[in-house]
């Protein structure tokens, strides 16, 4: 059971139903993934994955799916993962790109890009057209970012290693 400091409880009780917040905080996060439409279609990938597990759509992301049963196989070991057809991504992480709705030809700056879940999602939404700057301020995180960009076939992205203040006035 989670223990919250009183100051935290006081603060968040003003913003939300704290009992509901606490209940959801104690729940196990459901495993989820997103189909990478740069490399495959949603229907083709769903069909390929049916032999491993059942999926349920993520309501706010048409390429996102919850995995109903992961006990039989490690998703990161699947051929579909290695080929970049899917990206293991928490469903909550699919929300920002879905709200931003980047389009082909747009110019997008991702300030905290590693390991690349939202970056690869935006690149797919942009159909690899336009420019996506994938920035992170920690050198050791760029390796996973670069690896994921390559695995997912992202071609419209430049990676940078800067603190956020470097981009002040960036437009």
Enumerate the predicted regions with their spans.
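S-adenosylmethionine
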Residues: 1-171
């Amino acid at each position: 059971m989670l223990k919250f400091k009183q100051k935290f409880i006081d603060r968040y009780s003003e913003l939300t139903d704290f009992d509901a917040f606490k209940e959801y905080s104690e729940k196990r996060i459901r495993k989820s993934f997103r189909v990478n439409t740069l490399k495959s279609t949603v229907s083709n990938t769903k069909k390929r994955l049916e032999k491993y597990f059942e999926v349920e759509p993520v309501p706010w992301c048409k390429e996102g799916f919850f995995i109903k049963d992961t006990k039989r196989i490690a998703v990161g070991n699947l051929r579909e993962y290695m080929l970049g057809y899917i990206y293991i991504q928490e469903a909550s992480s699919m929300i920002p790109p879905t709200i931003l709705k980047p389009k082909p030809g747009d110019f997008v700056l991702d300030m905290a890009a590693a390991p690349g879940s939202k970056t690869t999602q935006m690149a797919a939404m942009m159909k690899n057209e336009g420019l996506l700057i994938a920035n992170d301020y920690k050198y050791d995180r760029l390796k996973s970012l670069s690896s994921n960009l390559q695995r997912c076939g992202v071609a419209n992205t430049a990676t940078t290693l800067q603190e956020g203040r470097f981009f002040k006035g960036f437009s």
